[in-house]
Amino acid sequence: MSSASYQDFGWTSEGAANGESGVGLAQTLIKRVTRLENVTRICDLGCGNGYITGRLAALGFDIIGIDASESGLQIARQQYPQAGFIKSFIEQTIELPEAGTFDLVISSDVIEHLYKPAQLLEAARFLLRPNGQLLLGAPYHGYLKNLALALTGKLDSHFTVLHDGGHIKFFSVKILSELITAHGFSDLQFSYYGRAPWLWKNMICHGRKND
């Protein structure tokens, strides 16, 4: 999302986004990070209030969180002083001196909020060292889940069309894979979180930057 179209709806809590569900997703993502090889330096792209960033810093990772939200970053800096935080819009990340130095870029529940989701992949690629890794989390959508929402009459509430802010894009595995590979990543592997198979709440994609 560009600076021209961004609106900060405000962070008011140090907790994970989306309550208990967000805690579970954050824990799942953190476990994935700890299992990756050759990862020391991490960028959390769209870090919000720093919930994930701070926990990875506590585990000993050299991590920087980037976000456009002043309210989120204020909480992050107060709660997690051991991590570094930078205010930047996604399209401005190419101006950061840290570009090209990260072993891993993570981004959890960010891409679905962007008018131009390709910018997130471009930023991740620019921030990563050659052959660096990407972990990207997003809400899962697929045929069976969408059908279940329609049959149970929950489509309107699910897509939150009357809310200020919220999700702008809705990704299936196929579409998210196409977007990620189109921007210079390969070896994609998906894992899932929440609910029964094919009705998953979230998906996490791991990929590697092409040299």
Regions from the language model: what does each represent?
Residues 104-110:
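A short beta-strand submotif of the Rossmann-like class I SAM-dependent methyltransferase core
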Residues 112-115, 171:
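Residue-level signal for the nucleotide or nucleotide-sugar donor/cofactor binding architecture
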Residues 10-12, 151-162:
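Short glycine/proline- and charge-enriched loop/turn segments
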Residues 1-100, 104, 120-121, 136-141, ...:
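Conserved N-terminal segment of class I S-adenosyl-L-methionine
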Residues 135-157:
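Conserved class I S-adenosyl-L-methionine
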Residues 121-130:
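A short glycine-rich, Lys/Arg-flanked "PGG" loop and its adjoining helix->strand segment in the class I
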Residues 71, 115-119, 146:
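Short N-terminal helix/helix-N-cap motif within the alpha/beta-hydrolase-1
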